[in-house]
Amino acid sequence: MKIKLLIALFICVNSYSQSALEIIEKSDAKLRGESSYSEITITIVRPKWQKTMTMKSWSVGTDYSVSLVTSPAKEKGSVFLKRKNEVWNYLPSLERTIKLPPSMMTQSFMGTDLTNDDLVKQSSMVVDYSHKILEEETVEGLKCWKLELLPNEEATVVWGKLIVWIDQSDYMQLKVEFYDEDEELVNLMNGYNFKMFGNKKLPSKIEFIPLEDEGNKTVIEYNSWEFDQKIPSNYFTTQYVSRLK
């Protein structure tokens, strides 16, 4: 009888583990498709001021993306190019493209509450963590899976743990809690204002909140979002970034 119970328990745990990975994979794939093009507004909020910028972004799979700043005038024309684990920055004022060194990867991206490393680790949830379903909860009126993600031993990641809420109907990431190595909650991400982009239902606004900095947050709003568009391969070369429009 004990052997049967152990076998049943093993099958149950293994089944949940597999389902958790599938949920994360489906959610991640939905965010990018084979390729995507988006126009976004980023608002940086601080206790005494706020700043808004707009960008265009193109991506292919998980390895290639390029973002063009379209406003304000001071930053207009700046480009961030991601190729696998490398990030390049084109500065129109200098007419130069520089590769960001490892020492700059943990620095703020354009003054936001995201880092340059966040750009590189876009698919990290799938490949760098083990996955486990904790329970079911309701977020924004939607029934969700609540998942725990723990880093693999060989993974070079910043976070000691992630708690992720993914809705059961459309696989949208509605909420993510980011914990440090001491399992202290550091950052929070919320997705809301759901819209249809083509045949995909997704949060059109994503909010990043650093809990240690009271009153600070970054809000990313997707004004348009198109998937599986044909994007020329030269968009993701250092030679072309100065010509993006």
Describe the residue ranges of each PLM region.
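Extended lipid/amphipathic-ligand handling interfaces
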Residues: 27, 55-59, 190-196
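Residue-level signal for tight coil/turn positions that link beta-strands
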Residues: 61-62, 84-85, 198
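Short hydrophobic/aromatic-rich beta-strand segments that constitute the beta-sheet cores
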Residues: 38, 65-69, 87-91, 97-99, ...
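Sec-dependent N-terminal signal peptides
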Residues: 3-14
